Amino acid sequence: ICEKPVPEHLIKKLDDERLVPEVVSRMKADLARMGSSRVPQPAQNGHVDFSTIAWPGVSARLPEKEGLISAIRQNYPGISLDDINPRSIRDITYYIGRKALADKYGITIAKAGHIIGLLDLVIHETDDGRIEIVPNNVHRFKQLYAHKGYVSKMLKLINGKEVADEDE
């Protein structure tokens, strides 16, 4: 799974998308570089490193606490700090992840979100505040990779709550 995180039958689905052929070629070339013989190590103290199986070249910095609160309040005017939850944080982080993919390939943010789902990938927020796009089947394997990342860290900073990412 880690050597070829996106199976060929899913990659072939890109051919059916309404994308410029050059974009499909670039995506396929990048996906071919995705993966490693190094399996991500099981989570240690809530930390997991999926960088060896992340979509190459797709990364974005996530906002610090105040920037995140500001972005959430744009989506949810009047929300109190106490009412901020994992979903309201992920509304921001997932947008940032889809936008990073969209910017890399010159596609719409909606199309980027569709492609992430089409390829059975997921947006992963690292605990050091970055976005990675990783295989869903590895990310959701909680027996080895249950983790607390950016969402849990920000929630604790914003309102004192802490939720393991898998508990949402």
Model regions: which residues?
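Nuclease and nuclease-like effector domains acting on nucleic acids or nucleotide cofactors
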Residues: 1-122, 126-168
